[in-house]
């Protein structure tokens, strides 16, 4: 199943047009409160069933209200499926570990994973990426399709960092196999990816 993971902020959200950086599928000319929306519209078809995993702050009414707004947005974009809410106490020292323990059980064999890291602290981003890496390695037929985050301060952008996450996975594998020149393999992989991109244009 296609699963979309995002963080619900504790603030009032304004609508913006999010510029796609590094991935044409994130292009979306419409204004939206949620930077997740371009992932939904770029990677799914109308009436396609999906699951959204929305991470909220424990006991925060605004964060939970933003989930209800997201549910409406999904319906307005003609997508179907459920929104699963994970409440996490981010004020606690082990909040990111709590997130990991709640997120990992929701990832299953055959999942195609899409992640919007907007509104996430550095530790929360690390926890989510760790969960992705677990799913990719421990489960069957899991793919990390798109990971995006915010761009420069003051700009409304969706910056695709999927290649960086995948490179981290590749380096981990090469390390386990005691490869003598992991940088060379990484360069070759990046060059191959660039050739494929040119072929698509």
Give, region by region, the residue ranges found by the protein language model.
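Long, low-complexity, Lys/Arg-enriched
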Residues: 1-112, 127, 133-201
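Short glycine-rich or small-residue beta-strand-to-loop segments that form or flank ligand, phosphate
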Residues: 113-119
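Polyanion-engaging groove/track-forming segments
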Residues: 122
